[in-house]
């Protein structure tokens, strides 16, 4: 089952070893020196490849570990100790220092980590200068003895040792890459969130990578000292650190021989261009830019991706059901998951409160409503509850996500979190480690590989398993993520929107799979917007409203519950001010949407939608979460490109226009979640709305008009918008949209998260805008609320318009509730 890359590795290393040994005995003394420097640079490159290629960290301070290795080796050999003892001592010391540096440094990532490693290199450099009694200060260490063995030429001996070290480093990397350690590092690199949900502690993986990288660099440095016979702090310039990183990136990070190719470049190019030494960094900088432009994965990385294609390996047509059942039912948590009165606040917002649930083994539970993903994040350890208990055999509340995963909870995500550079099979195999690294070179057994293939077949994946997961289609990504979660052998499986973007046929297959998993004894907790799926497979539903449970029951009980219907459609307490007079505007459509199709994955989220908005109308788009309402508004505003169909604004096509151009033409979006600029004042937030206009703006007069419309904002006009309440921020967002003087104001979920009082004030303002002749297109989860102010409405279900008509007609339509809660519902 080994792919071509795996088979080529050991053979290629052997060929390189043989070629290098021949070269050692064939080269003259100067060429031999250059060859040895290339070998040592390759070892450093392999070390950095562990850090960059496997764990995704960056270090511009590896010259410090190179120097540490060189000085320790020099001091030991000058003290009369043999080189064979000095080399491992130098490597171990560098590795230990690397681990100590990594533990605090890896609390940060990206550019911050790079800055810490740069600072470390300067600390080491100045320590070498100031610690004169040991390091010789600026004068350095001289007379470093050459190694001796059987009367061999010391230069040849050093070259052979450097070659052996390079070959050993390559063999080490090749074994590490395919081991449990390597899989864990690559998983953390691709997605720390997903890695934690499989039981991996990212700090441990990254610390090990840093330590191994520093160890290899220290080993290389230990041979530099006898090679040069003299070292001082200037032997280790900071610019060399940059060149080491460049060698890995240009050669191809994550590839076996990329660092070797990169080492040849950074050592040989200066030799070939010795007359232009002062331009060395400039030349390498240009080289880096050219390579990344032509080959963004590095030279060897691009070659491997384009020309080395493994023979496709697919899951078996027949599944060993007994093996899968034994594996998935092999947990001890027969009493299931207990959640008691959990809650959490974010700032001043109570996101969830008093949530309790018992999910027995072998059951499918469907939390739904506002706050469901927050509850999922608390169960899986990504959020720590402020109150309450979570138990699965033992208390879990407050444990980090990786410990929660090891306790028997696995999950998927709304947006798939696969390890993109890893193969489909490795994505599943890494989950079987259950967060444990094992021995350094341990590999997946044949039995594990066969089980992984069975799990992929179980979920319905039929594609190649030895291709990168990032190349998968959307539906296959969903299936592989579920298979990966199952590979962790959880007692509880949390599924967050698993049907998003799936076709109806794929969704039906998912329903069958979920029932099969429950039959294996798994507890399945399903968060899903597809209410037909939820109602079909769930044994019980927990319905949340603003993070607070309102009912628990069977699907049939939930569908009949008046509190649920009110939560999904909106209550009827609010009474909007009726229109001053019935709408009697022009029938020349201001906005026309024809056969609109919007794709995010394998299946369209909006399919052949047609709608019309006339001048002066308030039109609402209604439907359950995930029906496609917000996707339509984002597409109209130019934030997402339609797959097909047309959008006409005043009879001009705008479906291919940019978001800024569409705003300039007269469509202003008030986005979901308000999205004010928190550090700007209310006044500045409002002014930003007028920037798309092409006429002269009388800012003071127009802001005064906004303040008259929303009197609450007057006393807060100079306050940072981030300090306002949610309702006040929504008023700022609406005011910002009005400052654009739009032809149509698009409003996306304006009532979301607001108190009843604030909703009333906001909707009174929308009714006033309607009566003034402002054209509005409104999306709101609260159907009854939207129908209070709308003239007409369209009802969406799974991306299709299933009903349209006047607001009065739809308020009396019993089928409206079915669009939100599934079939068989009556309001």
Which residues are covered by each model-predicted region?
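The feature captures the beta-strand-to-loop junction immediately N-terminal to the Walker
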Residues: 365-367, 622-624
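Helix-to-loop junction immediately C-terminal to a conserved catalytic motif
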Residues: 380, 637
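ABC ATPase C-loop
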Residues: 486, 737-738
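Conserved catalytic motifs of ABC-family nucleotide-binding domains
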Residues: 489, 741
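Catalytic Walker B motif of ABC-type/P-loop ATPase nucleotide-binding domains
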Residues: 493-497, 745-748
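A short, surface-exposed alpha-helical micro-motif characterized by mixed small hydrophobic
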Residues: 534-536, 786-788
């Amino acid at each position: 089952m080994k792919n071509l890359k795996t088979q080529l590795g050991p053979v290629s290393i052997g060929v390189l070893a043989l070629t290098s040994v021949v070269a050692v005995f064939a080269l003259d003394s100067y060429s031999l020196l250059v060859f040895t420097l290339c070998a040592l640079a390759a070892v450093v490159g392999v070390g950095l490849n562990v850090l960059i290629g496997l764990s995704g960290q960056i270090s511009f301070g590896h010259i410090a570990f190179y120097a540490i290795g060189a000085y320790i080796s020099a001091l030991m050999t000058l003290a009369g100790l043999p080189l064979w003892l000095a080399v491992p001592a130098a490597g171990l010391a560098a590795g230990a220092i690397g681990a100590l540096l990594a533990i605090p440094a890896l609390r940060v990532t990206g550019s911050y980590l790079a800055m810490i490693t740069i600072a470390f290199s300067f600390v080491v450099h100045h320590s070498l200068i100031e610690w004169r009694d040991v390091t010789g200060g600026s004068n350095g260490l001289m007379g470093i003895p050459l190694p001796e063995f059987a009367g061999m030429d010391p230069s040849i001996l050093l070259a052979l040792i450097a070659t052996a070290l390079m070959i050993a480093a390559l063999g080490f990397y090749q074994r590490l890459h395919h081991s449990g350690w390597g899989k864990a590092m690559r998983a953390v690199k691709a997605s720390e969130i997903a890695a934690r949900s499989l039981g991996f502690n990212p700090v441990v993986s990254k610390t090990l990578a840093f330590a191994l990288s520093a160890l290899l660099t220290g080993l290389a440095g230990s041979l530099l000292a006898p090679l040069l016979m003299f070292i001082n702090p200037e032997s280790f310039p900071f610019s060399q650190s940059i060149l080491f990183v460049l060698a890995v990136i240009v050669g191809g990070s994550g590839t076996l021989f990329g660092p070797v190719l990169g080492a040849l470049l950074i050592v040989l190019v200066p030799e070939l261009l010795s007359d232009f030494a002062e331009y060395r960094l400039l030349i390498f900088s240009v080289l880096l830019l050219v390579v990344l432009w032509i080959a963004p994965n590095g030279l060897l990385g691009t070659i491997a991706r384009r020309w080395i294609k493994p023979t496709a390996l697919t899951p078996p047509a027949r599944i060993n059901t007994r093996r899968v059942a034994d594996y998935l039912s092999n947990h001890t948590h027969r009493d299931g998951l207990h959640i008691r009165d959990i809650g959490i606040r974010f700032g001043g917002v109570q996101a969830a409160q008093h949530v309790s649930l018992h999910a027995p083994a072998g059951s499918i539970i469907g939390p739904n409503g506002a706050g469901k993903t927050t509850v999922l994040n608390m169960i899986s350890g990504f959020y720590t509850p402020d109150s309450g208990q979570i138990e699965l055999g033992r208390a879990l509340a407050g444990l980090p996500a990786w410990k929660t995963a090891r306790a028997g909870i696995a999950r998927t995500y709304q947006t798939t979190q696969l390890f993109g550079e890893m193969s489909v099979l490795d994505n599943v195999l890494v989950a079987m480690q259950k967060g444990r690294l094992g021995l350094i070179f341990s590999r997946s057994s044949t039995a594990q590989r066969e089980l992984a293939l069975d799990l992929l077949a179980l979920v319905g994946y039929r594609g190649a398993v030895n291709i990168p997961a990032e190349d998968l289609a959307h539906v296959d990504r969903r299936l592989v993520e579920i298979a990966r979660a199952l590979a962790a052998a959880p007692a509880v499986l949390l599924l967050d929107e698993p049907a998003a973007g799936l076709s109806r046929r794929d969704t039906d297959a998912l329903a069958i799979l979920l029932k099969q998993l429950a039959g294996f004894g798994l507890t399945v907790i399903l968060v899903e917007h597809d209410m037909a799926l939820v109602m079909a497979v769930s044994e019980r539903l927990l319905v949340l409203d603003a993070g607070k449970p309102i009912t628990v029951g069977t699907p049939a009980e939930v569908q009949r519950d008046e509190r649920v219907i009110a939560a999904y459609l909106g209550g009827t307490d609010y009474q909007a001010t009726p229109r001053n007079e019935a709408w009697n505007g022009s029938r020349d459509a201001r906005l026309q949407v024809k056969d609109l199709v919007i794709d995010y994955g394998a299946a369209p989220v909006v399919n052949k939608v047609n709608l019309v908005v006339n001048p002066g109308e308030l039109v609402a788009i209604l439907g359950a979460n995930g029906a496609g309402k917000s996707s339509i508004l984002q597409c109209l505003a130019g934030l997402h490109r339609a797959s097909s169909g047309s959008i006409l604004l005043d009879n001009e096509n705008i479906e291919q226009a940019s978001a800024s151009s569409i705003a300039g033409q007269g469509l202003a979006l008030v986005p979901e979640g308000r999205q004010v600029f928190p550090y700007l004042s209310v006044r500045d937030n409002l002014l930003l709305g007028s920037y798309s206009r092409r006429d002269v703006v009388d800012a003071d007069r127009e802001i005064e008009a906004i303040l008259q419309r929303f009197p609450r904002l007057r006393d807060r006009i100079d306050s940072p918008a981030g300090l306002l309440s949610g309702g006040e921020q929504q008023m700022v967002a609406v005011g910002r949209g009005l400052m654009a003087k739009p032809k149509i104001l698009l409003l996306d979920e304006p009532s979301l998260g607001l108190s009843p009082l604030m909703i009333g004030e906001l909707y009174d303002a929308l009714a006033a805008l309607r009566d003034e002749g402002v054209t509005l297109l409104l999306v709101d989860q609260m159907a009854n609320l939207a129908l209070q102010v709308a003239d007409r409405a369209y009802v969406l279900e799974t991306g299709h318009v299933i009903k349209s008509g006047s607001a009065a007609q739809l308020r009396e339509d019993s089928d409206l509730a079915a669009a939100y809660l599934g079939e068989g519902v009556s309001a």
